[in-house]
UniProtKB/Swiss-Prot annotation:
It comes from the Bacteria. Transmembrane segments: none annotated. It comes from Pediococcus pentosaceus (strain ATCC 25745 / CCUG 21536 / LMG 10740 / 183-1w). Its EC number is 2.7.7.12. The gene is galT. HAMAP family: GalP_UDP_trans (MF_00571). This is Galactose-1-phosphate uridylyltransferase.
């Protein structure tokens, strides 16, 4: 059986709308996309391998250019054939939800992997390892999954007319969008509709997941990120609807926020992050009945709220957030405003712990200064050889997303430490010399030494981003802020 015939069978056997009666129609649809000549056969019977073969057939038949953008657009068009229509998918999701929330997300997650919306082959390239630090075990990842941008595609995209559709990559307008030069294909993309605060929101998976079942919850309306009472209410409502998931929001300011501030959205999934395991350093009283509160033993300044009453938890979170928005303490460089510009916000995270809800509220400050032009509470210059990008939600919780360059750069650091010929980047020199001076390095332990050191740098990165440091001055300043809340 040819790759084309095998894929036709996959389409008919899939949860798509097609049945055996549609076989000839589906066959001809695919022929129209890939061409009738020069068939390429798949290396195995995996759906992704069949699609790869069909895309190669299309290239050989001149149906598409042999360019990353064209190949991706066609692959997703083919995968769309094995994907239910949005209306059918939503109905099936909520039918399965009646069995259990987990049954519903399992169905949607597995479908999103099968139709290659979640790029499992690319994600498998990522490097990850644990690292023991003073704040417990952190999670280190080197992100290799996102495709490098093709210089030709970038140049061609510059000459494409910008029609502003879709408005951004998070908009619901992306569902089923064909894609174009410089804009990702989304033919096989599906969004579950859900209600939050009386409004329609979307739930989808992230194509290049950073952790298990990495999800995005997005506002139906294209409007900027904001942290307010409704944010806390929405996060707790999502956890109520999907109790096996955590969910959090990036901060709504540059430097301390994520990379997408233009569209209101949250991120969640099925993963227990290091911060969620971190203990309470000391309990505090916020004067909200039914809410236990405490300062978390964590490098970033975090207040944990625990309780079964979501309204009381929301009240407590708003109390913290509103106090922080206007709080300054010159003794520790904390300033809510400079020249009328706001600097304060929070990064909130919600999850279940048994019957209780937990809301972790992380204090953020995005000031810059002459000494720290990238941010006073941002990775400082001496750790930027490992991480210089913004510290967003996922990293706040203890999972490092480090740049792809480190995969090769750290190999060169290891060679340097072993006295071998190397091409180590100059920016790693001081760090590598310090490792050399403080460790007895052998061929057997060099990788473990470097990995542990990367973990300690990431702990320092988080400490740099923390507004109240774990020293006498910082702890006293944190105590003053707690008093100010009340």
């Amino acid at each position: 059986m040819s790759s084309l015939e095998q894929f036709v069978q996959v389409v008919i056997d899939s949860p798509s709308p097609y049945t055996n009666l549609d076989r000839i129609y589906v066959h001809n649809r695919i022929l129209g996309l890939v061409g009738e000549d020069q068939p390429v056969e798949a290396t195995d019977e995996q759906v992704t391998s069949l699609v790869d073969a069909l895309v190669k057939t299309a290239v050989q038949n001149g149906k598409i250019e042999d360019a990353q953008s064209d190949r991706s657009i066609l692959a997703d068009q083919l995968m769309d054939l094995v994907t239910p229509l949005p209306s059918i998918l939503n109905q099936r999701f909520w039918d399965k939800y009646q069995v259990s929330p987990k049954a519903a997300t399992d169905y949607f997650f597995n479908l999103s992997k099968t139709n290659d919306y979640i790029k499992t082959r690319a994600i498998a390239k990522n490097v990850s390892f644990p690292a023991e630090t003073d704040f417990g075990e952190l999670e280190i990842t080197i992100n290799l999954s996102k495709p490098e941008k093709d210089p030709k595609a970038i140049a061609a995209a510059r000459n494409q007319p910008q029609d502003g559709y879709p408005l951004c990559q998070l908009c619901m307008q992306n569902e089923g969008y064909l894609g174009r030069l410089g804009y990702p294909s989304r033919s096989n993309h599906r969004i579950i509709r859900m209600t939050l605060g009386g409004e329609t929101w979307g739930f989808q998976y992230s194509p290049y997941a950073y952790f298990n079942e990495h999800s995005i919850f997005l506002d139906q309306i294209h409007r900027p990120m904001v942290i307010n009472r409704q944010t806390f209410t929405n996060l707790l409502e999502i956890v109520k609807q999907l109790p096996h998931y955590f969910v959090g929001s990036n901060a709504d300011l540059p430097i301390v926020g994520g990379s997408m501030l233009s569209h209101e959205h949250y991120q969640g999934g099925r993963h227990v992050f290091p911060m969620m395991k971190a203990p309470i350093a000391r309990t505090i009283d916020l004067g909200v009945a039914g809410v236990e509160a405490g300062i978390v033993k964590w490098p970033m300044s975090t207040i944990r709220l625990v309780g079964s009453d979501v309204v009381a938890l929301t009240d407590a979170a708003v109390k913290i957030h509103d106090a922080w928005m206007n709080y300054s303490d010159e003794s520790v460089d904390v300033r809510a405003f400079t020249d009328g510009t706001r600097h304060h916000t929070t990064t909130p995270i919600a999850y279940k712990d048994g019957e209780n809800y937990v809301l972790d509220v992380v204090l953020r400050d995005n000031q810059t200064s002459a000494e720290f032009p990238d941010g006073i509470f941002h990775p400082h210059q001496d750790v930027q050889h490992i991480k210089k990008e913004n510290i967003g939600l996922i990293e706040v919780m203890g999972r490092a997303i480090l740049p792809a360059r480190l995969k090769t750069e750290l190999v060169e650091v290891e060679k340097y430490l072993l006295g071998q010929t190397n091409q180590m980047a100059e920016m790693h020199q001081a760090w590598a010399d310090q490792l050399k001076a403080t460790n007895s390095i052998t061929a057997e332990n060099v990788t473990a030494v470097v990995n542990a050191a990367v973990g300690n740098v990431f702990a320092r990165v988080l400490a740099d981003a923390g507004v109240f440091k774990w020293d006498d001055a910082g702890e006293a300043a944190f105590a003053r802020f707690i008093s100010a809340i009340n």
